[in-house]
A protein has these predicted regions:
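Flexible extramembrane loops and terminal tails that flank transmembrane helices
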Residues: 1-20, 24-27, 49-150
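Short, non-helical or kinked segments that cap or interrupt transmembrane helices
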Residues: 29-43
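Gly/Ser/Thr-rich active-site loops/lids in small-molecule metabolic enzymes
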Residues: 41-51
C-alpha cells in the first residue's frame, strides 16, 4: 500500500481513466482506437488501483471481472449473429433510423457517433472483454507475483 498522497490522487484519476477508455471505445469507428485500445486504457485503471491500494483490495473483484468478460463475449456473438439472415457480421443497424442507425452523410469522416451501425456496439463488447481480461491479468499478477525471496 502506498502513501496517502498516492491513494488520494488515484481516487481522483481512476474515474478519469475509465471515462477516457470509454471515449476511445465509443469513437473507435470514427477515429483511431476502438474496443481493444479503449479496453486497454480502461484496464490500466486496475493497475493504478493495484499500485496504490495493494493486491488484497482487488482480490474480491475476480468474479466481477469474469462475469464482465463473459458478457462481452456473448454480446459480441449476439451482435455478430444479428445479420445471419443475410450475411454473418452484416451491419444490420446501418441506415435503419434507430439507435446508431442514422444514414451516413457523404464525406470522408462525418464524425457522427450514430453513423456506425453495429460497429460501436461491437466496439463496446470487445472493450468489455479486454477490460475484464487485462484487469484479471493485473489482479492475478498482483496476487501471485512480485515476491522477491532474496
Amino acid at each position: 500500500m502506498m502513501s496517502v498522497v498516492v491513494r488520494t490522487i488515484t481516487r481522483i484519476i481512476f474515474p478519469l481513466v475509465l471515462v477516457f477508455g470509454g471515449y476511445v471505445i465509443m469513437h473507435g469507428h470514427l477515429t483511431p482506437g476502438g474496443g481493444f485500445q479503449g479496453g486497454a486504457v480502461a484496464a490500466s485503471a486496475a493497475a493504478l488501483l493495484l499500485v496504490a491500494f495493494g493486491a488484497p483490495r482487488l482480490a474480491g473483484h475476480k468474479d466481477w471481472l469474469s462475469l464482465l468478460e463473459d458478457f462481452g463475449a456473448l454480446a459480441f456473438l449476439a451482435l455478430a449473429f444479428l445479420g445471419i439472415g443475410v450475411t454473418f457480421f452484416r451491419n444490420v443497424l446501418a441506415a435503419s433510423g434507430g439507435l446508431f442507425g442514422a444514414p451516413v452523410p457523404p464525406g470522408p469522416n462525418p464524425g457522427l457517433l450514430d453513423s456506425g451501425g453495429t460497429v460501436p456496439l461491437m466496439n463496446w463488447a470487445v472493450g468489455l472483454k479486454v477490460i475484464a481480461g487485462l484487469g484479471s491479468v493485473v489482479v492475478l499478477f498482483g496476487l501471485f507475483g512480485g515476491r522477491d525471496d532474496r
